[in-house]
Amino acid sequence: MQTNLLKPKAINVDPLGGHRAKVTLEPFERGFGHTLGNALRRVLLSSMVGYAPTEVTIAGVLHEYSTVDGVQEDVVHIMLNLKGVVFRLHNRDEVTLVLRKEGEGPVKASDIQTPHDVEIINPDHVIAHLAQGGKLDMQIKVEKGRGYVPGSMRRYADEPTKSIGRIVLDASFSPLKRVSYTVESARVEQRTDLDKLVMEIETNGAISPEEAIRASAKILVEQLAVFAQLEGSDLAIFEAPAPRAQHFDPILLRPVDELELTVRSANCLKAENIYYIGDLIQRTETELLKTPNLGRKSLNEIKEVLASRGLTLGARLENWPPQGLDKR
């Protein structure tokens, strides 16, 4: 009796025009077409890395509800049009680009000044229209990311000193526009109960359908690899090993009050459940700056006090907190 599962032997990629393609894989054992097709589709739509504008500064504009003299669209519509520009960054994770245009006519994505390692996929995309004597001067920050990130959820390390006029955008990083799949019947010799997986993939051009399917498969393999590494009895799978006893430097077990920080800094730390020096040194500068009412001045004070004791932020402590430590 045959016990080995069939694996796909034929993989065909048929371009459908634009940035669309049909990917066909066969044969699969019955049921595997839906199992893998659904998993790949979900990963493609949710987990692909892409690029999107995340911040914009427009000369003469203080907020997104403003208008710009000589520009047909208001700022909200300019931002919506800007989200339609497809960027691709090579060997970098973020970049700030400049767009300057004067005179009557459309403002297109091709008017954005780009360095050699930044590519605009749809240069004819219209961002705005200028009237006679109109002028548009803006800076656009483009970042690498994954999924959809609302502007209201994005935090910045320099938020306490955020400049007036910087508009934060909702960012849709996903380069996938549409993914669908169907499962058809396949045949191998005398077997007719097999699956053929047919996927139609459409991207925005920042990534090809072939690259997208490879990247999604790689993500699935990496996520599932941990299950292939399970060893030992069934009991060992579900029982976590007992943590090894670890001795910490006594200074890490002291309360943050002993650092003699200002009342403002000490209260900010306690509000974040940071009671011990060991709790504090595991936080990064970025994490501390997100603490309400704790600004750059307080952060510098904390860093100086820690440095005087030979400590720094961003440390890693295994098995922290130790057993019996009162978390108050």
Curated annotation (Swiss-Prot):
A GO CC term assigned to this protein in UniProt: cytoplasm
Gene Ontology annotations of biological process type: DNA-templated transcription
Annotated InterPro entries: DNA-dir_RNA_pol_insert, DNA-dir_RNA_pol_RpoA/D/Rpb3, DNA-dir_RpoA, RBP11-like, RNAP_asu_C, RNApol_insert_sf
Reactions catalysed: RNA(n) + a ribonucleoside 5'-triphosphate = RNA(n+1) + diphosphate
Entry keywords, A to Z: DNA-directed RNA polymerase, Nucleotidyltransferase, Transcription, Transferase
Renumbered residue ranges of the record's region Alpha C-terminal domain (alpha-CTD): 248-328
EC assignment: 2.7.7.6
UniProt region (Alpha N-terminal domain (alpha-NTD)), positions on chain: 1-231
Gene Ontology molecular functions: DNA binding; DNA-directed RNA polymerase activity; protein dimerization activity
Assembly, per entry: Homodimer. The RNAP catalytic core consists of 2 alpha, 1 beta, 1 beta' and 1 omega subunit. When a sigma factor is associated with the core the holoenzyme is formed, which can initiate transcription.
Function of the molecule: DNA-dependent RNA polymerase catalyzes the transcription of DNA into RNA using the four ribonucleoside triphosphates as substrates.
Similarity comment text for this entry: Belongs to the RNA polymerase alpha chain family.
Domain description: The N-terminal domain is essential for RNAP assembly and basal transcription, whereas the C-terminal domain is involved in interaction with transcriptional regulators and with upstream promoter elements.
Protein name according to UniProt: DNA-directed RNA polymerase subunit alpha
Organism: Leptothrix cholodnii (strain ATCC 51168 / LMG 8142 / SP-6) (Leptothrix discophora (strain SP-6))
